[in-house]
């Protein structure tokens, strides 16, 4: 499980966008714009796990038979270009590496021992279709944290559900942030 802790094998495959960056023949060259085609491809790959199939079906439907101008394809291209304006391939590569190798249990007696040290009240939110932080992983995190509450958001938008389903999220967050003491 990842849960901000470590990655399961299937998640490592989904998140390994570094391969796309490394496949760009300019990556490794000593200039800031090197690896940009790979960066755009990495973003497109990442989007598939952020949004998920249901979210794409709802937001990117198209009657057009021309694959190259299909809404889903042009959306992927646009998002790749947008990321290239904000990052360079080297910084994104380093961020991906940090995400993929983070393990809160490292040198802390393992994941469970590290999480048991947390004394704060925690809120864990799962999203029904999230492929990055799955519901079983979020439920496992909830069980490992000594003082946590679990809620679930139902959304067809995968990991992006936390951005799209703001009304559901607000109903969960507001009582946690502003508790009423009776």
Question: How would you label these PLM feature ranges?
Answer:
Residues 107-111, 120, 131-143:
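Short alpha-helix in the alpha/beta-hydrolase fold that links the catalytic acid
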Residues 10, 101-103, 131-134, 158-161:
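Flexible loop/turn segments at secondary-structure boundaries
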Residues 10-82:
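Alpha/beta-hydrolase-fold enzymes
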């Amino acid at each position: 499980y990842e849960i901000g802790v470590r990655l399961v094998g299937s998640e490592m495959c989904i998140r390994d966008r570094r391969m796309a960056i490394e496949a760009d023949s300019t990556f490794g060259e000593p200039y800031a714009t090197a690896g940009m085609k790979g960066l755009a491809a990495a973003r497109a790959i990442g989007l598939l796990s952020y949004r998920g199939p249901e979210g794409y079906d709802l937001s990117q439907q198209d009657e057009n038979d021309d694959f190259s101008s299909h809404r889903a394809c042009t959306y992927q291209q646009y998002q790749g270009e947008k990321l290239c304006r904000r990052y360079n391939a080297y910084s994104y590569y380093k961020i991906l590496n940090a995400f993929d190798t983070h393990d809160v249990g490292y040198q802390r007696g393992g994941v469970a021992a590290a999480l048991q040290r947390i004394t704060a009240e925690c809120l864990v939110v799962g999203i029904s279709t999230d492929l990055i932080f799955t519901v079983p992983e979020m439920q496992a995190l909830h069980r490992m944290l000594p003082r946590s509450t679990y809620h679930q958001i139902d959304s067809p938008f995968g990991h992006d559900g936390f951005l799209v389903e703001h009304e559901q999220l607000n109903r969960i967050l507001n009582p946690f942030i502003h508790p009423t003491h009776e």
